[in-house]
Design a protein with these regions (language model features):
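Active-site-adjacent structural elements in enzyme catalytic cores
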Residues: 1-178
């Protein structure tokens, strides 16, 4: 975990295991890292981040107090919530329309420890180039991205699907991905 934090602090890119898929991570406040990540993915645009716990995730969001319990409940099971975020939480390069960002709390010990130790939100996007299937084996990740990624955290082969994604907008919910 300390090695991953060092790589992130230096503007590097990591591939790390989550409870759903391997993720590509960088410091969400480091614009050079985000540009490098976008180049790896062959795209630009919104990128989700991970939080160490639901309280932190809600603290990053710009939502009314009376919506917090519902959001906290939706964050269960590794779901991603797209919601407006407070200023200076992440770079605008990862934000979507209306200053929204997808935030999730993975049910994976490595993610929880890493996101608790690192001082900024860490990006979490599947390990693949846009339009291709996510890579689930550390060896495949290494072979495909050997010159692009600074550190691969080798856990196990992960054969899951991506998280469910919910959009919280204008006090209502829309499911974006099942």
């Amino acid at each position: 975990i300390s090695e991953a934090c060092n790589v992130l602090n230096k503007g590097g890119i990591i591939a790390y295991p989550t409870d759903t898929l391997y993720g590509l991570g960088c410091d969400s406040k480091n614009e050079q890292s985000i540009k490098k990540l976008n180049k790896i993915k062959n795209r630009s645009g919104p990128i989700s981040v991970i939080a160490p716990n639901r309280r932190t995730a809600i603290d990053w969001m710009f939502v009314k107090k009376n919506h917090e319990a519902t959001i906290k409940n939706k964050l269960k099971n590794g779901n991603t919530i797209i919601a407006p975020i407070k200023n200076n939480i992440c770079s605008n390069l990862i934000a979507g329309n209306k200053n929204t960002v997808g935030i999730r709390v993975p049910d994976h010990l490595f993610c929880k420890k890493l996101s608790k130790l690192f001082p900024h939100p860490i990006t979490s996007t599947s390990v693949n180039r846009t339009g291709e299937k996510p890579l689930t084996k550390p060896d495949d990740i290494s072979n495909e991205f050997i010159s692009d990624i600074d550190l691969i955290i080798d856990d196990v082969i992960i054969n899951c699907v991506g998280s469910k994604i919910f959009l919280f907008e204008n006090c209502s919910w829309k499911q974006r991905r099942r």
